[in-house]
Amino acid sequence: MATPRPCADGPCCSHPSAVLGVQQTLEEMDFERGIWSAALNGDLGRVKHLIQKAEDPSQPDSAGYTALHYASRNGHYAVCQFLLESGAKCDAQTHGGATALHRASYCGHTEIARLLLSHGSNPRVVDDDGMTSLHKAAERGHGDICSLLLQHSPALKAIRDRKARLACDLLPCNSDLRDLLSS
C-alpha cells in the first residue's frame, strides 16, 4: 500500500500528491465514468443506464474504441446484444481500423462473431494492416470462427494483408485449419 505524503498541515489523503503512484489522468477518469468501462467489465445494468441517459452507443473513446469493441473483445454477449439493439454501429473502426468483429474473431468469441454478422457486420473490412476478421481468427487458430466467416464470405480466403499474407499463412504450426483455409 502506498504511504501518504505529509502536507503542510500534516498527513493529508485528499491532497493530489498524498499517495504516490495512485493518480488518474482526466482521460482515464472519462473512460472509467463512460460506457466503455461498463462494456469492458460486462456491466449490462450500467450500460443500459448510460444509454438511457442518451449516451451514444457508438461514441469512441480517445483510442477510437467503442463500447461494442470492448464488449466484443471481452466476450460479453448480453452487452453486445443490447448495444446493437440500441443502435451501435457494428462496423465502427478504431484508429487502427479494427472493428468489433476483428476483436471478437481474434479473441475467439464465436457467438459474438455470429451476433455481429447477423446485425450486418462486414467480414471483408480490413484494418490498417490489411487484415480481415478471418486473418485475426486464423492467427489465433479459432477454427469455429474461421468456418463461420467463410460461410458468410468465401472470398475472404483470397484476401491478402499488407504483407501479402493470406489468412492461411498466419495459422499456428500444426493447425488443423490449413485444409479449410487453403484453396
UniProtKB/Swiss-Prot annotation:
Phosphoserine carried by residues:
153
Record keyword Signal present: no
Question: A Pfam family for this UniProt protein?
Answer: Ank_2
Keywords from UniProt, A to Z, are: ANK repeat, Phosphoprotein, Repeat
In terms of SMART domains, this protein maps to: ANK
Q: Which PROSITE patterns match?
A: ANK_REP_REGION (PS50297), ANK_REPEAT (PS50088)
Which Cys pairs does UniProt list as disulfide-bonded? none
Spans of repeat ANK: 30-59, 63-92, 96-125, 129-158
Provide the family line: Belongs to the ANKRD39 family.
Query: Which protein are we looking at?
Result: Ankyrin repeat domain-containing protein 39
Protein species of origin:
Homo sapiens
Which taxonomic lineage is given here?
A: Eukaryota, Metazoa, Chordata, Craniata, Vertebrata
